[in-house]
Amino acid sequence: MATIHVDVVSAEASIFSGEAKFVALPGEMGELGIYPRHTPLITRIKPGAVRVERADNGEEEFVFVAGGILEVQPDRVTVLADTAIRGHDLDEAKAEEAKKAAEEAMKNAKSDIDFAKAQGEFAAMAAQIAALRKFRKK
């Protein structure tokens, strides 16, 4: 069976590297599904869950990404994430707290720049919570 090599990296570390049967993630224009021998592609990714179906045991790996860039080659997928957290390391309480703080920051923003920063943080935390709940269902 054909496989595709997947690397998920953040500024801090390599989060996942291995062979996969399938990768799904939130692209800028919608959900993307990538199989081996996919057409080359570069696109931005939105905050959300990256799902990797491992080739060795068929298990699914989940990684939350807070946006970034996706590069697809026929034999390789590279996710360059702004922030990436393994699914089992996500903390819903911290994410809820950060989401509330971002909501307050949006209410108290003194400039458009401050509002945009808070809005981005709010969207990232909402996506992280959604990814965590999706991960828990598996």
Swiss-Prot record:
The keyword Cell membrane applies. It comes from the Bacteria. One of its GO terms (cellular component) is proton-transporting ATP synthase complex. GO terms for molecular function: ATP binding; proton-transporting ATP synthase activity, rotational mechanism. Its main location: membrane. InterPro entries: ATP_F1_dsu/esu_C_sf, ATP_synth_F1_dsu/esu, ATP_synth_F1_dsu/esu_N, ATP_synth_F1_esu_C, ATPsynth_dsu/esu_N. It is found in: Cell inner membrane. It is a peripheral membrane protein. Keywords: ATP synthesis, Cell inner membrane, Cell membrane, CF(1), Hydrogen ion transport, Ion transport, Membrane, Transport. HAMAP family: ATP_synth_epsil_bac (MF_00530). F-type ATPases have 2 components, CF(1) - the catalytic core - and CF(0) - the membrane proton channel. CF(1) has five subunits: alpha(3), beta(3), gamma(1), delta(1), epsilon(1). CF(0) has three main subunits: a, b and c. Produces ATP from ADP in the presence of a proton gradient across the membrane. Belongs to the ATPase epsilon chain family. This is ATP synthase epsilon chain. It comes from Methylibium petroleiphilum (strain ATCC BAA-1232 / LMG 22953 / PM1). The lineage of its organism: Bacteria, Pseudomonadati, Pseudomonadota, Betaproteobacteria, Burkholderiales.
